[in-house]
Amino acid sequence: TASVLSGLRYLSYWWDDRKFSIVSLILIVVFGYIFCVYFYYIFKRMKDRIDLLFVLFMIPIGISFMFVMLPDYVPDEQSHFQRAYLISNLNIKTIKEVYIDSDYGIQKLKSYAEVFNNFGFNFHPTYTLFEEASNYNALVYLVPGIALGLGKILHLSLYTCYYLGRMANLALFISVVSYSIKITPKLKNVFFVFCFNPMLIQLAASYSSDCSIIAACILSVAYFLYLFDKEKIETKDIMIVCSLIIFIFLTKYVYLPIFGIYFGVIPKLLHIS
């Protein structure tokens, strides 16, 4: 993580100046080489543990995505961030108005150098009213909201909190997908490759509400494969599936048809233990 951040910080200044530098070229080559060696070494050591392999691959890639994407430059991210900020104030009402640290401005930062210059602490914040908070269910913003709240308690600057929330969303995605890969008895490689879709990583490394929703859908498919291969379905399995259905229903019910695959395990319901 430290290597990723250091490399991105240096490259940000080079990119903003748009001047060729042999040092920058060498850094890019070395940075890329380290990544390749790291991936090869981890793959050789842990190719039988696809779930852990996913975690170790996704962490540096996800963090790179997270810092390369400037704040609010992911589609609709400003509305998602404002909703998460509202949740961090322990306000779960569906309203559009939220007071945010005055350092915040929609697409305010125009360069990567500005991002790193805005990291730090702010012990005397002032607040400005914004009116673009999304109206999605509070459940999808709970994890980044908690991270934002923790950042405010520690008096971190607005954009330090911003990236802390992004990191929390990324951690949620990595955790859920890793568990999904772990429990599925088959198609582990398919899950692994699918979750490295660049558009999916972009959502996971931002405030997008689709991050937790898609993660829940991936878990739902993996859990179906787990139950389909299981001899007897237990009561706890029914509770987990019902919880996933309720979550999807409350957050984005258009994804509910995905649970139609569970008709494939209905015969096993006669053997609930």
Question: What does each model-found stretch correspond to?
Answer:
Residues I201-Q202, D237-Y253, I258-G264:
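Membrane-interface alpha helices of multi-pass inner-membrane proteins
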Residues D48-R49, L156-Y159, V177-P198:
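Transmembrane-helix signature of polytopic, membrane-embedded enzymes
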Residues S88-L164:
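Interfacial juxtamembrane loops and adjacent helix segments
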Residues Y179, I213-K230, L244-I245:
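Specific aromatic-rich, kink-prone transmembrane helix
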Residues Y223-K232, I258-S273:
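Perimembrane helix-loop-helix junctions
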Residues C36-Y41, I146, T160-L187, L219:
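Transmembrane-helix motifs of polytopic, lipid-linked glycan transferases
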Residues Y13-S64, S273:
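Start-transfer (signal-anchor) and selected internal transmembrane alpha helices
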